[in-house]
Design a protein with these regions (language model features):
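Acidic active-site catalytic centers that drive phospho-/nucleotidyl reactions
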Residues: 29-31, 99, 122, 175
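Hydrophobic helix-and-loop "lid/oligomerization" segment in the mid-to-C-terminal part
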Residues: 2-27, 34-73, 84-94, 174-329
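A generic local secondary-structure boundary/capping motif
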Residues: 11, 83-86, 107-110, 136-138, ...
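Short alpha-helices
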Residues: 121-191
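Glycine-rich, phosphate-binding/catalytic loops in enzymes
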Residues: 39-40, 112-115, 137, 190
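Active-site cofactor/cluster-binding pocket
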Residues: 77-135
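An acidic intrinsically disordered interaction segment
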Residues: 1-10, 111-119, 140-145, 149
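Short, acidic Gly/Pro/Ser/Thr-rich loop/turn segments
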Residues: 29, 103-105, 126-128, 179, ...
Length: 329
């Protein structure tokens, strides 16, 4: 439990800060939001002046439900409000970055520039775009950042409202694909602990409900499925459809449920100028090595990379070349 090993340093940074800003990655998912809210509750229990930094204009369904239901209950600000809320003594400001360590994926580049004192709490692998000037608490053996924050909540003996416990549990359920991926005894214990605080499995399912049209659009990618070497599932979207990162990730998760499949790669456009690749593995195939060669990153279970100014066909060729090289090694 890396987060508990580093608790003393984290405690000191929190204690010394007058203003604390919490942010996660762009396109918030339930792990990013759940861990951010969990950290927010920890800080509030210590009477700290803290804010959630959220710049996203649109949200996936579960995140939207939570933010709507908690409207007015959380101190949420956008990037343009950060400077006005900073402590005049810059050494007394602290930025907590959750569920990502990549500078190009954070909610607010403004926060990165304005706040020199940074701590990253994350379960993803590092890469060339990892934020350099931060103290990093990283555990890529942990299922989710929500699991890491749950360890802190228990250790600090934080009193948590059942709904907040439910939100954090939903992040664990999301990132483990309902406890089928990257799940350990510690993951089950974290879920048990949140349940003991009143987390509701029924409400977790409510938060995980999907939009029918978005689900249908994602399923179209399954009709374009290709299997490489009888164990690698590969699919790509058409250039006419824009997907979110989490959409590609969900398809990559789904592909692992097919017989004999050990890893999956999904390619799709994230915007008009950006193509994303999402990859998943059962742990027997080194997807992180492939993604790092392509400029991305990850670990033995999941990873991603993005390409600017390239077509889907060009990205497909690059990914397949790296797969072929790895298969030949």
């Amino acid at each position: 439990m890396e987060i508990l090993k580093n608790k003393r340093i984290l405690n000191k940074k929190i204690k010394n800060a007058n203003k604390i800003f919490i942010m996660a990655h762009k396109n918030l998912d339930l792990d990013a939001l759940g861990s951010s809210i969990g950290m927010y509750k920890i800080l509030k229990s210590r009477k700290k002046d803290c804010y959630l930094v959220i710049d996203d204009k649109t949200h996936e369904l579960g995140v939207e439900k939570i933010l709507k239901e908690l409207d007015g209950c959380l101190d949420v600000i956008t990037s343009d409000k950060i400077e006005a809320n900073l402590s005049k003594n810059m050494k007394k400001n602290l930025l907590l970055i959750l569920d990502t360590n990549k500078k190009d994926l954070v909610q607010s580049e403004t926060a990165l520039k304005l706040i020199p004192n940074k701590v990253i709490i994350d379960h993803h692998g590092v890469g060339k775009n990892t934020i350099k000037d931060a103290f990093i608490i990283r555990d890529d053996n942990t299922s989710s950042t929500c699991e890491m924050i749950t360890n802190l909540i228990e250790n600090y003996e934080i009193e948590l409202d059942p709904y907040f416990a439910t939100i954090i549990l939903s992040g664990i359920v999301l990132d483990t694909n309902n406890f089928t991926l990257k799940t350990t005894a510690e993951t089950y214990y974290a879920a048990y602990y949140l349940s003991s605080l009143g987390a509701s499995a029924k409400k977790v399912q409510y938060l995980l409900k999907q939009d029918i049209l978005e689900y249908t659009e994602r399923q179209k990618l399954l009709t374009r499925l290709e299997v490489i070497d009888d164990k690698i599932a590969f699919t790509k979207a058409t250039s006419s459809t824009i997907y979110r990162r989490e959409d590609l990730a969900k398809i990559a998760d789904t592909l692992l449920f097919f017989n004999n499949i050990e890893s999956s790669f999904v390619i799709g456009k994230l915007d008009q100028d950006t193509v994303g690749v999402s990859a998943r593995s059962l742990g027997n195939y080194n997807i992180s090595k492939i993604l790092e060669k392509l400029g991305g990153g990850g670990d033995e279970y999941n990873g991603a990379c993005v390409f600017k100014k390239k077509s889907i066909s060009q990205v497909e060729k690059l990914v397949k070349e790296q797969i072929k090289k790895q298969e030949g090694e």
